Amino acid sequence: MINKNKITLKPLRDEDIVLFSTWLDKNYIYKWLCPDGEKQREAWLDQVTNKNGEFDFLKHFLVYYGDRKIGYCLYADCFFLKELEEEGHDFEDLYGDVTEENHTYEIGYLIGEEEYLNKGIGKIIVQLLEDKIIAQGGHEIAADPSEENIISIKTLLSNGFRKKSDGDYRKTIA
């Protein structure tokens, strides 16, 4: 049984990028995060390393269970995200309706350690991200899972998200 209180989010550090890269290479993660292949994988690594500050609006975290690193998550202000060009994503199409900063935030998450899959941790991660976005003053949370990613969609729906369109799930929080 998972103890919800032992799950925490801590900012991703430079030394965590190797672990994140290892998780990206796992088939069950790669198929959802990198459906367009290696260019998309490299884009993920560029975003988490953020060498030139271009991705400062992306907030990256590692998910811990106690002291063990078990996953990754992020949130991003969609006002800035809609300007990002990334293969496989049309953020302008998704978030063109976002007209102000600090209103709508996109979230993403993964469980990198297989033994922690199917234990309800995704639901807890979404709740912890929601708490962070509320603390920022956000009003809406968005997620863009593939429609084939049934587990992720069920996690979002169980957290109060509603389907706006294929690959666009939203939750009003304030």
Indicate residue ranges for each PLM-predicted region:
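A short helix-loop-beta-strand connector motif used in the catalytic cores of GNAT acetyltransferases and
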Residues: V48-L62, G71, F79-E83
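A short beta-loop-alpha structural element at the N-terminal edge
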Residues: I7-T22
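Conserved GNAT-fold acetyl-CoA-binding loop/helix
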Residues: Y28-T49
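Conserved catalytic-core motifs of GNAT/GCN5-like acyltransferases
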Residues: D144, L157, R162-A174
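Conserved beta-strand-loop-alpha-helix junction that forms the acyl-donor binding cleft
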Residues: G112, A143-I153
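Conserved GNAT acetyl-CoA-binding A-motif
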Residues: I133-P145
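Conserved acyl-donor/pantetheine-binding loop and adjacent beta-alpha core of acyl/acetyltransferases
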Residues: D77-Y109, L117
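Conserved acetyl-CoA-binding loop-helix of GNAT-fold acetyltransferases
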Residues: N118-K132, K154, S158
